[in-house]
Amino acid sequence: MLSSVVIAASEEQHNPLIPEPADIVGSLICFVVILFFFWKLVLPRVKKLLDERAEAIEGNIAKADEAQHKAEALLEEYTAQLAEARADAAKIREQARTDGQKIVAEAKDTATAEAARVTASAQAQIEAERQTALVSLRGEVGSLAIDIASGVVGEVLTEDKKAQAIVDRFLADLEASEKATSNEKAGTAN
């Protein structure tokens, strides 16, 4: 059996792990041809395609940056316009408030002036009516006093100027004493 192993080893058989030299040369020629076609045809197309993609990506990035800058500029402009609109609205509100206060003040002044005018007119009318009533009352009091005096004396007294002057003086003294009394009451109340 040992002899058969030695015989088998002595016969040279081909090792499947080491290729034949003719196979190596043929494979090398095919590899070089494929490499040449790949180098001349496929690689430039792939490189061109990658360059186009890179340019497209860079262009999109540039467009995105430009759009972002435009958006930021528009945002700043919008913010400025919004701030300006708010300032204008504040001015308008303040102007309206000021105008409202002026209108209220004018209305108060007008109402106060009207009230003062009405009060003065009423006081003047009251004073005129008081004077009219006082003159009428003096005349009637004078007539009554003369009639009473005529009844006491038993003679008919005429309404002459002297009698009228006495009655007027008496009424004036009466008014003066009433004013003095009211002033004394006002002085003690304080």
Curated annotation (Swiss-Prot):
<feature type="transmembrane region" description="Helical">
    <location>
        <begin position="24"/>
        <end position="44"/>
    </location>
</feature>
<dbReference type="InterPro" id="IPR002146">
    <property type="entry name" value="ATP_synth_b/b'su_bac/chlpt"/>
</dbReference>
<dbReference type="GO" id="GO:0005886">
    <property type="term" value="C:plasma membrane"/>
</dbReference>
<comment type="function">
    <text>F(1)F(0) ATP synthase produces ATP from ADP in the presence of a proton or sodium gradient. F-type ATPases consist of two structural domains, F(1) containing the extramembraneous catalytic core and F(0) containing the membrane proton channel, linked together by a central stalk and a peripheral stalk. During catalysis, ATP synthesis in the catalytic domain of F(1) is coupled via a rotary mechanism of the central stalk subunits to proton translocation.</text>
</comment>
<dbReference type="GO" id="GO:0046961">
    <property type="term" value="F:proton-transporting ATPase activity, rotational mechanism"/>
</dbReference>
<dbReference type="Pfam" id="PF00430">
    <property type="entry name" value="ATP-synt_B"/>
</dbReference>
<dbReference type="InterPro" id="IPR028987">
    <property type="entry name" value="ATP_synth_B-like_membr_sf"/>
</dbReference>
<keyword id="KW-1003">Cell membrane</keyword>
<keyword id="KW-0812">Transmembrane</keyword>
<dbReference type="GO" id="GO:0046933">
    <property type="term" value="F:proton-transporting ATP synthase activity, rotational mechanism"/>
</dbReference>
<protein>
    <recommendedName>
        <fullName>ATP synthase subunit b</fullName>
    </recommendedName>
</protein>
<keyword id="KW-0375">Hydrogen ion transport</keyword>
<keyword id="KW-0066">ATP synthesis</keyword>
<keyword id="KW-0406">Ion transport</keyword>
<dbReference type="InterPro" id="IPR005864">
    <property type="entry name" value="ATP_synth_F0_bsu_bac"/>
</dbReference>
<comment type="function">
    <text>Component of the F(0) channel, it forms part of the peripheral stalk, linking F(1) to F(0).</text>
</comment>
<keyword id="KW-1133">Transmembrane helix</keyword>
<dbReference type="InterPro" id="IPR050059">
    <property type="entry name" value="ATP_synthase_B_chain"/>
</dbReference>
<keyword id="KW-0813">Transport</keyword>
<keyword id="KW-0472">Membrane</keyword>
<dbReference type="GO" id="GO:0045259">
    <property type="term" value="C:proton-transporting ATP synthase complex"/>
</dbReference>
<comment type="subunit">
    <text>F-type ATPases have 2 components, F(1) - the catalytic core - and F(0) - the membrane proton channel. F(1) has five subunits: alpha(3), beta(3), gamma(1), delta(1), epsilon(1). F(0) has three main subunits: a(1), b(2) and c(10-14). The alpha and beta chains form an alternating ring which encloses part of the gamma chain. F(1) is attached to F(0) by a central stalk formed by the gamma and epsilon chains, while a peripheral stalk is formed by the delta and b chains.</text>
</comment>
<keyword id="KW-0138">CF(0)</keyword>
<comment type="similarity">
    <text>Belongs to the ATPase B chain family.</text>
</comment>
